[in-house]
């Protein structure tokens, strides 16, 4: 646990230190990301400018996993055609769940911002992959697009990526929340930590979100994806938490 905290701190401080090299863009993007948590452009730019240390970490996570290596090699893209395919899937599939999330929020994959501040091609793809699977993650864990729900997802993604934008989004979003919603952040953090990536003997396997072939599961039952990935959706986590049935094995 202590090593994870140290590693997270290193990635956060490394990202901020690296951002100083692009000071004007950093100041502009960080102001937009913190003052308005719904400022997509500001958040996207801030995420990239502060990402370098975390991106190297994310690349290592992918290279250490067979599916992650395959994703880095093939470099799949989440496109509007991906969503169209998902729309054709029957109820009960992950594709149906993803398409429903996108419809509720009037989203298109093509609406995601391009990568503008990461020069290394491989790291740029890692950042793009993270950005493109964000809606898959929302659909998987069962969280919508309110500020409270978005911050919960950011806490979860922080555990999987170490990107500084996750913590900064939480700091920037807090003033927009009611007191009861602020108190919920502790619960969301508990859920996020319980679902951090791990492949330890005797412990519950949890895949890193970067190493999940989300597109492959679009025509598969949602339950199959949950079983394979090991991440406990929030509603299931809360039920287990209430019943005292949470465990790591």
From Swiss-Prot:
Amino acids binding Zn(2+): 134-135, 138, 150
Pathway in which the depicted protein is active: Cofactor biosynthesis; ubiquinone biosynthesis
Subcellular location: Mitochondrion inner membrane
Catalysis: reaction(s): a 4-hydroxy-3-methoxy-5-(all-trans-polyprenyl)benzoate + H(+) = a 2-methoxy-6-(all-trans-polyprenyl)phenol + CO2
Membrane topology recorded in Swiss-Prot or TrEMBL: Peripheral membrane protein
UniProt EC number: 4.1.1.130
GO cellular component, one term: extrinsic component of mitochondrial inner membrane
One Pfam family hit: Coq4
Keyword set, alphabetical order: Lyase, Membrane, Metal-binding, Mitochondrion, Mitochondrion inner membrane, Ubiquinone biosynthesis, Zinc
GO terms of biological process kind: ubiquinone biosynthetic process
Enzyme class: lyase
Needed cofactors: Zn(2+)
Family to which this protein belongs: Belongs to the COQ4 family.
Assembly and interaction partners: Component of a multi-subunit COQ enzyme complex.
Additional remarks: This protein may be expected to contain an N-terminal transit peptide but none has been predicted.
PANTHER family registered for this protein in UniProt: UBIQUINONE BIOSYNTHESIS PROTEIN, UBIQUINONE BIOSYNTHESIS PROTEIN COQ4 HOMOLOG, MITOCHONDRIAL
Entry-linked HAMAP family: Coq4 (MF_03111)
Function: Lyase that catalyzes the C1-decarboxylation of 4-hydroxy-3-methoxy-5-(all-trans-polyprenyl)benzoic acid into 2-methoxy-6-(all-trans-polyprenyl)phenol during ubiquinone biosynthesis.
Designated name of the protein: Ubiquinone biosynthesis protein COQ4 homolog, mitochondrial
């Amino acid at each position: 646990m202590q090593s994870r905290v140290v590693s997270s701190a290193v990635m956060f401080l490394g990202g901020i230190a690296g951002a100083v090299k692009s000071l004007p863009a950093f100041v502009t993007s960080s102001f937009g990301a913190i003052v308005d948590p719904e400022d997509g452009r500001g958040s996207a730019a801030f995420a990239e400018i502060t990402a370098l240390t975390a991106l190297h970490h994310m690349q290592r996570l992918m290279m250490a996993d067979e599916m992650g290596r395959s994703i880095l090699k093939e470099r799949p893209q989440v496109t509007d055609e991906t969503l169209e395919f998902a729309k054709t899937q029957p109820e009960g599939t992950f594709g149906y769940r993803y398409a429903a999330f996108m419809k509720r929020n009037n989203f298109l994959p093509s609406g995601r911002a391009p990568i503008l501040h990461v020069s290394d091609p491989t790291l740029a793809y890692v950042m793009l992959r993270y950005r493109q699977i964000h809606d898959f993650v929302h659909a998987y864990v069962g969280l919508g697009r309110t500020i409270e729900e978005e911050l919960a997802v950011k806490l979860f993604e922080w555990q999987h990526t170490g990107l500084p934008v996750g913590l900064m989004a939480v700091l920037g979003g807090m003033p927009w929340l009611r007191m009861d919603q602020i108190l919920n952040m502790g619960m969301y953090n508990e859920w996020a930590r319980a679902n951090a990536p791990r492949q330890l003997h005797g412990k519950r396997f949890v895949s890193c979100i970067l190493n999940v072939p989300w597109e492959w599961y679009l025509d598969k039952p949602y339950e199959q994806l949950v079983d394979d990935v090991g991440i406990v959706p929030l509603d299931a986590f809360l039920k287990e938490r209430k019943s005292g049935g949470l465990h790591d094995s």
